[in-house]
């Protein structure tokens, strides 16, 4: 590494530490939703396989969870696998499901989960996932269900429109069965028909890769979320990039439609 590169890295680290201390002075978001975009484009850019790009993306999720805990951000939701992702090749989908399955099994052995009492929850249409993955998800959720310091949500087999449509179907069935008075339905009752209505709405939604859209992610829940778009691909997303997103959020005035 050249002297200029070393100096650049040193300056970046100093700036990161300064920004970290600045961010700690102000209220942080309670809940962040993250659209982890750009694994495949990253892989093509650096000359590795797309599967290796997905592995790098999985490792980045683990890093970001640590960053969230460092800032006492209590809830984070990662958009891990959308319903649209089923359109990819069967080979890629199969690889992703096994990667996710192995990641969950690693969580069961990760002392950070137990030390920090991280509740792990999956949101999505689990019926469309492979049986082996559903079983692993069940074990992880059962193991961590009483942990309440932090919450790690993974949106898998998830689509925002599908979530709302599924909620409407369940509401219709309950109304027809006499379990629900449709005239008493309000936003709070409606949200309890979502995949997990207990999860607070995200304060901030962050997307990597330079794309500026939310791509069917938490459509109901993001009505008043702040949005932040980062130009870097997900595996390259650095702690400095993360701090910049939080700092940007802290400089905004949330109006909630007022």
Curated annotation (Swiss-Prot):
Q: Report residues binding substrate.
A: 38-41, 54, 82-84, 86, 88, 207, 213-215
Keyword list (alphabetical) reads: Magnesium, Metal-binding, Transferase
Keyword Magnesium in annotation: yes
Cofactor binding notes:
Binds 2 magnesium ions per subunit.
**Which Gene3D superfamilies did the record assign?**
Decaprenyl diphosphate synthase-like
Query: Which NCBIfam families does this one have?
Result: uppS
State the name under which the record lists this protein.
Tritrans,polycis-undecaprenyl-diphosphate synthase (geranylgeranyl-diphosphate specific)
Q: Which organism is it from?
A: Thermoplasma acidophilum (strain ATCC 25905 / DSM 1728 / JCM 9062 / NBRC 15155 / AMRC-C165)
